[in-house]
């Protein structure tokens, strides 16, 4: 028995019940990719698809203007821009705890559960945005970076040459951290 799962001798993995599987970490990105594929199949060359905050931009707006999207400053109840990204045949997905959290005994907890512990993540990462050709991959990676936190997440993102933008809470407010791959895309290199 491993974490409520049984591995039978014939190599079948059985789950006898009691476990909930939540695919929301990739569902919106999956939907964005499916809509984009449909548009592509009909010869649409310029579009911006958005589902629940996950976006994919292809081509450009009228007059060759880029699809520009904002990464919000992670402050509950406030909508301010932290970073602007031009989506050039690229998707962006953001995960964070500044809107989705719960309170228990006067303490705020992230809605993101660390599968390694079974408890809400506990670190100072407020928001993470990932750029990728696939919205589903960006969506899943944003959640993974949220679980890993700023230090492990940055190391993983750099090792895998991912385009990731972290916003970390500090005693003085927030600090922006980004990978070289993110900087290259944002700076148009």
Locate the predicted segments by residue.
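Mature catalytic core of soluble alpha/beta enzymes
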Residues: 3-189
